[in-house]
Swiss-Prot record:
The keyword Ubl conjugation does not apply. Part of the 30S ribosomal subunit. This is Small ribosomal subunit protein bS18c. The gene is rps18. InterPro entries: Ribosomal_bS18 (IPR001648), Ribosomal_bS18_CS (IPR018275), Ribosomal_bS18_sf (IPR036870).
Length: 101
């Protein structure tokens, strides 16, 4: 085999096929919180289809279910817990005044 044909041959590497994130028996519904919470980031954002490894139809149904759950207050729109956390080492003394006599 000459050199020009050899460059186009692909190496045959084996790969493990991942399980689909949604099985055929799972119902995509706004009440199914255990299923919906797998497709939301820590900040509360809907993860993309590439990250979720979903089909187009599944991603659309998941997005609709998440939005319905948000409207019905089952899910938060944003999850900003880190913003409100305070470190224990720094005491809060901004409002205290000491009188000097």
């Amino acid at each position: 085999m000459d050199k020009s044909k050899r460059l186009f041959l692909k190496s045959k590497r084996s790969f493990r096929r991942r399980l689909p994130p949604i099985q055929s028996g799972d119902r995509i519904d706004y009440r199914n919180m255990s299923l919906i919470s797998r497709f939301i980031s820590e900040q509360g954002k809907i993860l993309s289809r590439r990250v979720n490894r979903l089909t187009l139809k599944q991603q659309r149904l998941i997005t609709i279910a998440i939005k319905q759950a948000r409207i019905l207050c089952l899910l938060p729109f944003l999850n900003n817990e880190k913003q409100f956390e305070r470190s224990e080492s720094t005491p809060r003394t901004t409002g205290l005044r000491i009188k000097n006599k």
